[in-house]
Every structure is written in structure tokens, then in C-alpha cells.
Regions:
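Short N-terminal helix-initiation segments at or just after the protein's N-terminus
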Residues: 7-17, 144-152, 199-202
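Flexible glycine-rich active-site/ligand-binding loops centered on an Asp-His dyad
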Residues: 28, 88-104, 155, 222, ...
Length: 260
């Protein structure tokens, strides 16, 4: 499927300040960038680098006043995600080096505190994909999707207590529960077609059966039509904007449309 994805951010700056964005989709095996535009108003210099997770980051020094960022991409992506209940657990000693970091606790994913819950959810299941899907289903069933009940400091352990959150919180809890079972799991941010209400979205991938599989605890089924922007251990690694001065995000607009 071809998708046209777009995002506009409008900032008001009270001072000149550095700003780092993560808004450009990745170009790889699962998705191909066919067209892309990245426009700043005013037209200030931008440099780009690749972070340690392979994400594209746009770095700039924004000036006092209004800054508008418009990014648009046409992307060829997968209409469905792969489902494979035969994908088994990969012993730690057999994991690829790059997967190890996604097995450890992180800022928002206190997997060391959640082993008992992870074991309770997955006991008597085959090791691997079936465990991850059981975790996804448990979070979808037991956590209420609700805006305004969590904040940027809310962690996976917090969500177990409050049982409310948004896609970022659902994802953090799934990550922590998978890692508690020594299953590498990483956060993914990007776009999802037909998401309601439309916004940038977060989901996760787990490493079982010697590859990464996609899961989303906010959805009823394994839906495709996703465009990946970035990967990380948790939200700390994949913020769409990291600001280093006195500025305010006054407007944000996101769009995902199918291209016939």
C-alpha cells in the first residue's frame, strides 16, 4: 500500500534555541520512501545525523519567533504484519548483539519490577511469539485507553497501578513485560493508517524466532499500513522533538492518506 503521511509542527520561541527533531520516516526493507519534502519556515539551516538506533535526526538552531515545520512523505509499506505463533523464544546466548540492549530495563520500562506479572500472564504458553501476543492481549484488555490520565513521566510500573494511558503507555508496559521474560522488545514510533483520532503513534516489536515481529496493544488485530519513523528502548529515545530552550508547541497536525 502507498501512504501519504504528513506532519506539521508550529512553535513559538521566546529565545534562540537548539531543537532536534525526529520526523523523517526510515527507508528500508519493510518500507520504501518514494517522495519526501521537509520544509522549515523561516528557512533556517538544518543538519542531519543518524543516532545509535539508526534513526534520522534533524538538528537546527531555531530563532526567536514563530517556527513552522512541514514534513510530507509518500511511502510504500506493508498492508499486513506477519503473524507467526511458531516463532520461538531465542536464548540469550543466541541473540544478535544489537538485540541485547532491548532486553534490559530502561527509563520508562522497569522490567525488573514486573517479572511476577509477566509470568502470571504467560504461564503454560509456548515460549516466544505466543507469550508476546498474550502480553499484548492482556494490556489491551486490562488497561483503559484514556487521554489526560498519564504524563511524560509516567512509566510502565505506574500504568500497572493506574490502569489507564495512551499508546505510549500501552507500549511501555508491553516492552517491560516482554523484557521481564528475557524477550528483546523495542518501541516503534510513526504513522498508522486509519488511526482515530489521528496522531503520531507508538507500538512495539519483539525479537522471537530470529526476527522482529510487530505488535500493537491499542489495536484489536495485527494491522499493517504503518510507516516507521524511529526505534528505541522507550519514549526517551524516540521523541519527535527535543527542545533546549524557551519554546512552546502551539499547534500539531498529522495526516495519513492512502495513495491510489
Amino acid at each position: 500500500m502507498k501512504l501519504k503521511v504528513a506532519c506539521q509542527l508550529v512553535y513559538e520561541l521566546k529565545e534562540n534555541a537548539p531543537l532536534i527533531l525526529m520526523l523523517r520516516p526510515q527507508n528500508g526493507l519493510e518500507q520504501q520512501i518514494l517522495e519526501e519534502n521537509f520544509v522549515l519556515t523561516p528557512n533556517i539551516p538544518v543538519s542531519e545525523y543518524q543516532d545509535v538506533y539508526g534513526n534520522l535526526c534533524q538538528r537546527m538552531f531555531a530563532t526567536l519567533g514563530k517556527l513552522t515545520i512541514n514534513t510530507t512523505s509518500i511511502v510504500e509499506t506493508q498492508a499486513h504484519v506477519e503473524v507467526n505463533f511458531d516463532a520461538g523464544f531465542v536464548p540469550v546466548e543466541n541473540l544478535p548483539n544489537e538485540a541485547i540492549i532491548y532486553m534490559l530495563p530502561s527509563r520508562y520500562c522497569e522490567s525488573d519490577k514486573l517479572f511476577s506479572l509477566a509470568f502470571e500472564i504467560t504461564q503454560n504458553l509456548p515460549l516466544g511469539y505466543a507469550q508476546v501476543d498474550a502480553i499484548r492481549q492482556w494490556v489491551k484488555t486490562h488497561i483503559v485507553y484514556e487521554y489526560g490520565r498519564s504524563s511524560s513521566s509516567t512509566s510502565a510500573f505506574d500504568i500497572v497501578q493506574t490502569k489507564t494511558g495512551v499508546c505510549r503507555d500501552f507500549t511501555h508496559l508491553c516492552l517491560a513485560l516482554c523484557r521481564a521474560l528475557n524477550i528483546p522488545a523495542r518501541m516503534v514510533v510513526g504513522y498508522l493508517h486509519d488511526l482515530k483520532p489521528m496522531d503520531l503513534h507508538a507500538w512495539f516489536e519483539a525479537y522471537v524466532g530470529d526476527k522482529w515481529y510487530t505488535f500493537d496493544a491499542t489495536q484489536n488485530s495485527a494491522t499493517g499500513n504503518r510507516v516507521v519513523i524511529g526505534y528505541g528502548r522507550d519514549a526517551n529515545d524516540v521523541a519527535f522533538a527535543s527542545q533546549f530552550g524557551d519554546m512552546e508547541l502551539v499547534n500539531m497536525w498529522v495526516s495519513v492518506e492512502e495513495v491510489k
